[in-house]
Amino acid sequence: MLALHDKRVLLVDMDIGVRSLDILLGVSERTVYNWGDVVKNNVDYRKAVIDAGRNLFLLPAPIDFSEEYTPEKFSECIEKYKKDFDFIFLDSPAGLESGFLLSAKASESCVILSTRDNISIRAASYACENARKNGVSDVRLVVNKFNKKLHKKINVDEIIDTVGARLLGIIPDSQDIYAGVNGGDIPYDCKGNSAFLRISKRLCGENIPFRAKNL
């Protein structure tokens, strides 16, 4: 939604080896370089970026980890892109692998995505704690795949307290979203769009209240 509202957005895939964002964006066949090439100075940083359309761009992850991928060098890599984009999202995998630690060192803020299940909440809490340990003070939470009918007895405040982060938004459990993503299409027109719009406005600094009917 940020990209659709005249914001240039760069997605950085931090899932070294798996590299999933190129599939989700439908640009796998156009992937040539990655941020590892930029860190190693094998290619100009601009050539590593793929234009996914509608102000959305991708910087793919490398296939293998290298000792050259230090927090300092990776932060320098990300710094090069700041003048060209309004938002840069470092999409880290679940768990606290090298991708997460590199992301934390290079980030000014952190958005943690969690579902309602207890395992996901525990992982989100651990990620929040470690993000702060690595110098990220602004940590926010997005609750994903929330079903009002199934989760009537769930107190969202309890999730917030357990994770220890401010709530940024709640994404409904929508088949439209996941069908589009799995098909390599960005689901711009889906039932969850209002939730994405509220989240994007909050990221832009707008004061969008949380209402029970939107949960």
Annotate each PLM feature:
Residues L11-K83, N182-G183:
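P-loop/Walker-type NTP enzyme "switch/lid" segment
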Residues R122-G135:
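Conserved C-terminal guanine-recognition region of P-loop GTPase G domains, centered on the G4
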